[in-house]
């Protein structure tokens, strides 16, 4: 009897051990919504960690918003480290780029110019472009941490200014302004819709990356080849599966596709920002995220590939690579002629794309052909066909990729790096350093996978309160370039001479005579646009004898302080933005081995 009882106990113990072993061995589950490169990366990384992953894609095929031709040309490891890591891991062969496609060139009134040609034939235009680049570099240098671009109130104020407004102040000659506008709208969006702080932050990220680094090799087949390699690794992919709802509870998440419900512990949302508004989420997104979905600016980009029997442009000009036009042709990408034929990819961007949205595909192509015909009379006769990619009118994306407008970094910076309970977010729009690029999509997928892993281990990604932006640092005034830039930007170009004129007023008194020499730091207050009387009253202001003087300055300072006020208004949102200061740290865990880089979309 005793032996029977012992046998029963042993069986119970074996059963308990087996059950606990099964519990330990049972893999975590996740659903990835969106089959662009961000979603594919997140699914691949989670599956590599032993997770059971299901990827749902609304369209008939995965791959996302990769371009027609630009995505074939990729940067080197300096420009796109993570992309190059995956290319090496999957043993994809890239072909070194010919030298003549590695630097941009120009098409001015139908005439082709390399950078060297421009310097000799149109020196005024070339000098103006250099002046613009130097001014932009001054701004970029003033951002010490591109992950926190609005680190002080002066930089924060740049977010309230459009790029177009800043370019107006540079007084560029017309042709140079047209070419610069075209470059900015091609890479981001229309200058009048773009935050100056965003342009400065992106320039800071790519400050040490040369144009030659961006076009270092060709990936035959483009980003679709990389997408295919991810697909080969993944076990469960369901296309034609548009998600309509996501419901979370304490035990997991249910994702609805029509009448079918998929269940998992966690979800990665890797869809374009606008597509989020079409998915009902329970619990619902907070007001700040809903505002971001509705108002965050997306760059408008349409790509038209025109096919010709033979090159219709001047055969003496070796036109190939990225060519910026000062006319309505936008940015041209001319493929090297193959088998006697020639392809031209024309990128219509910004407002050039917006005004074409009412046109059908054939009408749009005809409009572009009319413009080409004006410069190249053989164009229509040699034309054989076309391909189109119109991201701007795609309802699922609402544009090509993120391009922060004025005031939007202040409101939405790093907002999507914070998970919503069991849902993490990925996509080019969630990456701080390389939004709108292949590199940004890959980085965001890695970061989301790391966050989901962290959530399963009990890690929290709730925001932590961050200090408000620091006041602008006077020290930078001594650095000629930066001080001069901010001085001019906020109307201080006249403020510097004025203190000099005031100096004589104080000079009559022998004791204060040295004081006029000390005022040089005074121009640091130039954002306040001091009145003519200010320099004389500055000394009293420091001793605080009369508080009326500060009262007079107050109205002027309020103008400059307004951004700071608006910055404080969304106190919680600021916390939310800076909160991801921790998630990025986690993000660095997996991506750490790989730095950021750039080239197409998610």
PLM regions and their residue ranges:
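Beta1/beta-strand and adjacent pyrophosphate-binding region of the FAD-binding site
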Residues: 24-38
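Core beta-strand elements of the Rossmann-like FAD/NAD(P) dinucleotide-binding domain
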Residues: 28, 257-266
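Conserved flavin/dinucleotide-binding core of flavoenzymes
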Residues: 41, 252, 300, 316-496, ...
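Glycine-rich FAD pyrophosphate-binding loop
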Residues: 47-68
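Dinucleotide-binding Rossmann-like beta1-alpha1 core, especially the glycine-rich loop
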Residues: 69-138
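Active-site/ligand-binding neighborhood in enzyme catalytic cores
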Residues: 144-242, 249-252, 261, 270, ...
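Flavin (primarily FAD) binding-site architecture
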Residues: 269-287
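Compositionally biased, proline/threonine/alanine/serine-rich low-complexity intrinsically disordered stretches
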Residues: 461-602
């Amino acid at each position: 009897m005793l032996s029977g009882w012992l046998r029963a106990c042993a069986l119970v113990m074996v059963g308990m051990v087996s059950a606990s072993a099964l519990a330990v061995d049972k893999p975590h589950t996740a659903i990835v919504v969106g089959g662009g490169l961000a979603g594919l990366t997140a699914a691949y990384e989670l599956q590599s960690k032993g997770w059971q992953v299901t990827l749902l894609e609304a369209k008939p095929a995965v791959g996302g918003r990769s371009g027609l031709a630009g995505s074939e040309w990729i940067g080197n490891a300096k420009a796109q480290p993570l992309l190059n890591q995956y290319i090496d891991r999957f043993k994809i062969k890239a072909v070194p780029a010919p030298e003549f496609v590695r630097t941009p060139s120009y098409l001015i009134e139908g005439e082709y110019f390399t950078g060297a040609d421009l310097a000799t034939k149109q020196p005024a235009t070339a000098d103006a472009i250099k002046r613009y680049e130097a001014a932009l570099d001054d701004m970029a240098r003033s951002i010490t941490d591109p992950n926190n671009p609005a680190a002080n109130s002066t930089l924060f104020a740049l977010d309230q200014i459009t790029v177009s407004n800043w370019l107006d102040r540079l007084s560029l000659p017309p042709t140079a302004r047209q070419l610069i506008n075209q470059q900015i709208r091609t890479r981001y969006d229309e200058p009048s819709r773009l935050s100056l702080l965003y342009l400065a932050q992106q320039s800071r990220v790519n400050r040490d990356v040369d144009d030659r680094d961006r076009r270092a090799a060709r990936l035959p087949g483009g980003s679709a080849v990389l997408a295919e390699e991810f697909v080969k690794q993944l076990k469960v992919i369901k296309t034609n599966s548009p998600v309509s709802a996501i419901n979370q509870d304490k035990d997991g998440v249910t994702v609805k596709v029509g009448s079918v419900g998929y269940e998992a512990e966690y979800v990665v949302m890797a869809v374009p920002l606008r597509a989020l508004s079409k998915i009902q989420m329970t619990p619902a997104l907070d007001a700040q995220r809903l505002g971001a979905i509705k108002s965050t600016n997306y760059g408008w980009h349409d790509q038209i590939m025109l096919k010709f029997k033979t090159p219709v442009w001047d055969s003496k000009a070796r036109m190939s690579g990225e060519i910026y036009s000062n006319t309505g042709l936008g940015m041209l990408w001319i493929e090297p002629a193959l088998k006697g034929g020639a392809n031209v990819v024309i990128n219509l961007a910004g407002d050039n794309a917006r005004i074409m949205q009412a046109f059908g595909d054939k009408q749009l192509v005809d409009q572009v052909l009319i413009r080409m015909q004006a410069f190249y009379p053989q164009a229509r006769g040699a034309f054989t066909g076309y391909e189109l990619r119109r991201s701007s009118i795609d309802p699922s994306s609402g544009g090509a990729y993120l391009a922060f407008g004025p005031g939007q970094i202040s409101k939405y910076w790093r907002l999507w790096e914070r998970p919503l309970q069991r849902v993490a977010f990925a996509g080019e729009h969630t990456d701080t350093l390389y939004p709108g690029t292949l590199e940004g999509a890959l980085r965001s997928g890695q970061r989301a996978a790391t966050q989901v892993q962290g959530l399963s281990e009990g890690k929290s990604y709730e925001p932590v309160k961050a200090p408000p932006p620091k006041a602008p640092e006077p020290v930078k005034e001594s650095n000629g370039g930066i001080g001069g830039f901010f001085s001019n930007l906020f109307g201080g170009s006249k403020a510097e001479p004025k203190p000099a004129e005031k100096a004589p007023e104080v000079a009559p008194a022998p004791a204060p005579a040295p004081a006029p020499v000390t005022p040089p730091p005074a121009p640091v207050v130039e954002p306040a646009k001091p009145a003519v009387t200010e320099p004389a009253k500055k000394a009293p202001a420091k001793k605080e004898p009369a508080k009326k003087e500060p009262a007079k300055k107050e109205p002027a300072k309020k103008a400059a302080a307004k951004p700071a006020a608006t910055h404080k208004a969304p106190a919680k949102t600021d916390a939310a933005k800076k909160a991801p200061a921790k998630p990025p740290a986690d993000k660095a865990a997996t991506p750490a081995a790989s730095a950021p880089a750039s080239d197409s979309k998610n």
